[in-house]
A protein has these predicted regions:
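Soluble FAD-dependent oxygen oxidases
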Residues: 1-405
């Protein structure tokens, strides 16, 4: 999403081209960025005056083993294209909430999507990668081959190399229930947040809910939820939606059964980034009364124009915290706020910081050093530093939350 003014954009067409680009770029005294879809909030996919390795030409999607639902996806593909390719098989992969996002960035950071509570994070569906390392070598990593590297790729891959192919195990998904619920929460913002959080946590794992709010408009605060039930049974869908609908007075609603691919249709053109987004991120175990109250104050302060909470839990918590570089497995919610100015958003957000037990790097633009330790617990960070020394000792890949030497 961040605009940039790079000096040179390289568009390799295959892994050997990516390797050649890395070997050349590392000899140049300018910043190096890697871009797949260019939609990333954190802004690591562009720079000013440097080199971008743009992966948009690597966009193939192929089924390599129907019996295990094994799918090979290149990083320049967009998630809406992946959904469309898998739909005829009755399969789907959880990703995010927008089909225009590129595979490469999301699938190396985490992936908090509409099927998250039933399928886990996107990285939890990953079975192997092909990756170009800082020295230009092309290697494979999986649980059986270079398992240390495979561990790091799942949550911090952008620090370790450029993934040129992902092998996922897709999930079996028929049509899904999708509902948009709109509430007027003006009179009780904090109470609504508590009730919605409790409803989400008590929902079966086939149900995932995303909440979007903004500052008051015409004196009203409106909350919109996007809710996905991984079922095509109408009675099941309605039973899952009712507790979410009961959290506050409804002023708008629609529900339908549709193919998963219809939720993440990609835009017709590649993303054209503009501006300098300012965002803050936090991971939350529960929406407590104290957090809800301070979040309501954040909204009324107008420091944020876009406030979103995504449901985690369910399958995302089945994975042990030390199994991947994304270690914050106790989190039930991902919280993100976008603001117009860094100073105002940081001031208000920092009052919430003590509620969080981590952050999601893809939603964070604050580059203060402590954000790195928020993103990765001490044991995880120590392990990542060891991997960095082994696979990228010269810190070729450093344009996002760089690990210190």
């Amino acid at each position: 999403m961040r605009g940039g003014n790079p000096g040179l954009v390289l568009q390799p067409r295959d892994p050997s081209g990516v390797a050649e680009a890395v070997r050349w770029a590392r000899t140049q005294p300018v910043p190096l960025s890697v871009r797949s879809g260019g939609h990333g909030i954190s802004g690591r996919s562009t720079n000013h005056g440097g080199i971008i390795i743009d992966l948009r030409q690597l966009q193939s999607i192929e089924v390599i083993d129907p019996s295990t639902r094994r799918v090979r996806v290149e990083p320049g593909a967009r998630w809406g294209e992946v959904a469309a390719a898998l739909a005829p098989h009755g399969w789907a992969l959880t990703s995010g909430d927008y089909g225009g996002v590129g595979v490469g960035g999301l699938a190396t950071a985490g992936g908090i999507g509409f099927l998250g509570r039933s399928q886990g994070l996107t990285i939890d569906r990953l079975r192997a990668v092909e990756i170009v390392l800082a020295d230009g070598s092309v290697v494979r990593a999986s649980e059986a081959e270079r398992p240390d590297l495979f561990w790091g790729v799942r949550g911090a891959g952008f620090m370790l190399g450029i993934v040129t192919a992902f092998e996922f195990e897709a999930g079996e998904v028929d049509d899904v229930g999708f509902a948009q619920l709109v509430h007027d929460v003006t009179s009780d913002v904090a109470g609504f947040l508590e009730r919605w959080g409790a409803a989400v946590e008590s929902s079966p794992r086939d149900t995932t809910s995303f909440l979007i709010m903004g500052p008051p408009r015409d004196g009203r605060i409106i909350a919109q939820t996007m809710n996905v039930v991984a079922s095509d049974d109408s009675e099941t869908i309605l039973s899952r939606l009712q507790p979410l609908a009961n959290t506050a007075p409804l002023i708008g609603q629609q529900a339908q059964i549709l193919p998963y691919e219809a939720l993440v249709v990609p835009p017709p053109a590649i993303h054209d980034a503009q501006g300098q987004p300012v965002s803050r991120s936090g991971l939350l175990d529960h929406i407590t009364p104290e957090f809800a109250k301070q979040a309501a104050e954040l909204l009324r302060s107008r420091a944020t124009y876009f406030f979103q909470i995504r449901a985690l839990g369910g399958a995302t918590q089945d994975v042990p915290p030390d199994a991947t570089a994304f270690a914050h497995r106790s989190a039930a919610f991902s919280v993100v706020a976008l603001g117009a100015t860094r100073t105002q958003l940081d001031r208000e957000w920092d009052t919430l910081a003590h509620h969080f037990n981590g952050l999601y790097v893809s939603f964070e633009t604050d580059r203060r050093p402590e954000r790195l330790t928020d993103a990765y617990p001490p044991a995880t960070l120590a392990r990542l530093r060891e991997l960095k020394h082994r696979y990228d000792p010269d810190h070729v890949f450093k344009d996002n939350f760089p690990l210190d030497r």
